[in-house]
Amino acid sequence: MKHLLILFLLLTTNAFAQGPFGDYAVVKDKDGYVNIRAKENVKSKIVGTLPNNTLVYEFLDEEFNPSNWVHIDSGYVHKSRLKMVSEFPSIGKGKEQGNSITIAGKGIIVTLTKQPFDKTKHKITKKKHKEYSEYIIDGKKIYGRDNDEFLPKDHYKSITVTINGKNVPIPKSAYDDLYEIGIWDTNNFAYYDKEDDVLYIIAHNGDGYLAYEVCWQIVKGEYKTRIIGEPL
């Protein structure tokens, strides 16, 4: 009986444990771009290129990727051609106030605000899979929940960014599928690449095996893209 209990605890712990996250990085090469190789070799066939400041999400830590090569798109890129976003200067530490957190510094102000989820204001459907069903909200797969047992508690109300007094519009589509928001200074960060005028905002949301992170990229005062990162 004791052995069965231990086995049960191990299985349930693994089921709800959060695995390691990857790293956000950008292409940085003196040539202005990096070659994508078919194989992990500098003499391998070039199957594509990525321009500088292309945002990627990969496992760069040697523990998970002992090779000097990273698999991106249809091939491989050498690690030396990537710079981790967290290596750029932080604009400052976030300050929490109610349902918002503001990160400010270097002429930049970033405010992320969450609000309770009101099911009466959204179209909610279910997508059935072989062994479970998941909620689809406003036609989108959602992050922070993975089944139809519970509706999300909260989601982003807005994300506002100003750079040197100029407002940077962030489209609703950049955050309207993100739920279970963490408004803490240990979950939210902003980094600025002054040389190329690129702002990166990173948020960690969700909990346990449903945790996720997101990085928004703003290039020369305009929103460009985002990448969602999920643990292994």
Describe the predicted segments one by one.
Residues 3-13:
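Sec-dependent N-terminal signal peptides
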Residues 19-25, 33, 46-82:
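SH3/SH3-like beta-barrel superfamily modules
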Residues 40-45:
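Short alpha-helix capping/helix-loop boundary micro-motifs
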Residues 76-141:
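Surface-exposed beta-loop interaction hotspot
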Residues 108-113, 142-144, 197-204:
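Short beta-strand elements that form the blades of beta-propeller/WD-repeat-like
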Residues 136-184, 188:
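Mature extracytoplasmic domains of secretory-pathway proteins
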Residues 172-214:
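Acidic, glycine-rich flexible loop segments
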Residues 217-232:
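Short, low-complexity, Pro/Ser/Thr/Gly-rich segments in the mature regions of secreted, periplasmic
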